[in-house]
Amino acid sequence: MRPLLTTFPSLIVLALVLAARPTVAAAQEFGFDPPPSATDPALPAALRDLAERIVPIYTDDDSTRYLANLAALQMTAGDPAAAHESRIALDKRLQSKEGRSPAGRAIVYAIYVQARMTEAEEHVSFASAFRQAFRATFEHLDDLAADDLEAWILAPSEPLREAVQHELDLQHDKHEIALEPALDLVRAWASFEAYSSIESLVRPLLTAEKERRYIVDEEVAIPVADGATIAATIVRPRAATENGKVATVLEFTLDRSSRDAREAAAHGYASVLALARIAGELAARPRAPFESDGDDARAVIDWIAQQPWSDGRVGMQGTGYGGFVAWSAAKRLPPALKAIATSDPMAPGIDIPMRGRIVLSSAYRWIYEMLPPPGDATPNDAAHWRKFDEEWYRSGRSYREFPTLPGPASVVFRRWLNYPSYDRFWQKWLPFGAEFAKVDIPVLTVTGYYSAGQTAALYYFTEHHKYDPNANHALLIGPFDEQTVEKGAPPSARGWIPDEVARIDPNAARYEWFAHALGGDESSELIRDNVNYELTGANEWRHAASLGALEQKRTRFYLQASPGGTANALAAKKRKSPSSLTATLNLRDRKDAAWRPSRELVLDVLPARDGTMLFMTEPFSAPVDVAGRLSGVLDFTINKQDVDLVLMLYELRSSGEYVKLFDPAYAFRASYAKDRVHRHLLVAGVRQQLPFQSEKMVGHQLQAGSRLVLALGINKRADSQVNYGSGKDVSEESIADAHAPVRIRWHDGSFIEIPSP
């Protein structure tokens, strides 16, 4: 798998071996008075003296750890030849013991050690020696291995310097150092010395390496409709295309600088990275996002299929907007399109500008940043736009009067507000209904439990399988958010420590899938069924034939008031005697203008919100698996004709911590819960039942002793529409339509169902 360089630079620049602790002579103390700064010219000599004293006495019962530490000590002591021999012995041991080749950072260090040895033995400059070692290593690597190693070799040295400084700070005002901290310092120094020495040398060598391996066309103008062109970068693997034709991986993006067109080429494909017209030349831009992309993609696919280097097969990939373009192209069924793989694909009308039919003000910011007026000087920071939201919210004006700025973005946003239902305006850009059954190609969708993009990702997946139960469409979902859905879960994020098995590289998994879909390789162990999910807390990837199969077994919990002021209950049985709970919310109140939900995934306390009620189970006596979508029936009486509801699930651990099972919360407009195409208003003052199914998937193992907690409330936030419940178009409502506070009486027929395979 590819190293997670862009996600975890600090991991790459840590010591050569993690947790490399000696088991012998740990009590040894060494006199040591280092300079206080990692960049002090006197530090190398001080560390060399320290290393020279440790090498003769250092032993460790763990031979792998011993060899790794010994190599760092030998390099620091100025003996690269001995360090080279230690690295060779370590590599042989890893291959014989674990059956694996050295990791990327170990190869980088081996190149550095070889260069220092050549410098000493042949009396040449380090730059010359490094070039020799670099070329000798890279000439034996295939394109993919070379691409992987490039990510490691470009790691910055500054975090390494910080690691050295941290170790020095621990020795402040001390005159002796124990063996363990001495090894920590030596390893940190060895890494810093290596990377800082090669930092200025690697880029010219990598450029030459790319020229040797790839044919690159930086600015290709591909003709599309209306006399316009799509700007594309095309990278082809030189060896493969000189020997024959290859399949192509096409990706549309809003910013070519944010993507590496060489990535697909390293996997053996012709790589075409195309700039969506909405982000291209002003004269050729369509009037709004989404409008031309499907037809443009079809034209680009047809063009690719006619090129002499193309074997006629095109796979599409993309994240966010690029994922939308792939699906918009699939709607048009171009013959050469053979597979699509997307991560958090956008779906206009589903997750932008609204989710759960509730329009989000962030959609306006997104349009504005894409279509800024000439000479725009609007601050591009969260605080500015947050103030924008709060000023509108406090004003009580209708959403139609949201304070947009001059320019085309305002026109687009207001036009979108005219279509609150998922009607033909939105349907025209994507497969709809039975059109999904015509998408008869392999599809992969990647998303995360903590990603806002999960809403659209699950929409594509469920609709495709709904209209074609035999669709070749796989879902890969784990504890990822918007930032990590491509790069994988880090060791910790937002207060949460993901399971070890979740720390995969979804990007590498996507190319493994392409090798299966386009190349006929065996399917990967990770993506071996239609639903592939990491059960957080269980440290295990699981697989199911469908969401329906996964959700076949459900556990029902009734929402019940608890006597005596204790927490409301999620009860396994419905009470015989009728009961109810009443929630109220003053829609005129604006004291909450600054409130936003915490992005932390583990909370010490849940936020107290007017109109929100908490329900919890008894502690579970054994671990409980929860995997699938939350569903249920809300049995209630309300004094309004509509309401926006919000639901959230937590695990309340015996430690008192609340762990989110998904994020963001599931918010939805009640009048669209049954049908996103047609609005069905509520009946004020009448008891009614509202079935619902969350657009969020859960994959979590509740610990023994934990409780399941449901937060059920009324959605009212400064950064989205406010539904005042009058029954009018919500964008037309203002605070004048609020009238009496919302009053919902939750009857004891309300229940949720938890899928528990």
What are these regions (language model features)?
Residues 396-397, 485, 492-757:
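C-terminal, loop-rich substrate-recognition/catalytic regions characterized by aromatic stacking residues
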Residues 238-306, 488-497, 653-655, 664-667, ...:
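Cap/lid segment of the alpha/beta-hydrolase catalytic domain
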Residues 30, 292, 317, 321-389, ...:
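A catalytic-pocket lid/entrance helix-loop region that shapes and gates access to the active site
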Residues 439, 445-447:
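Short beta-strand/loop motif that positions the catalytic acidic residue
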Residues 7-21:
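Bacterial N-terminal signal peptides
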Residues 201-244, 616, 620-622, 680:
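N-terminal cap/lid segment of alpha/beta-hydrolase-fold proteins
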Residues 455-473:
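Active-site-adjacent alpha-helix of alpha/beta-hydrolase-fold enzymes
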Residues 139-196, 200, 204-209, 266, ...:
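Accessory cap/linker subdomain of secreted extracellular hydrolases
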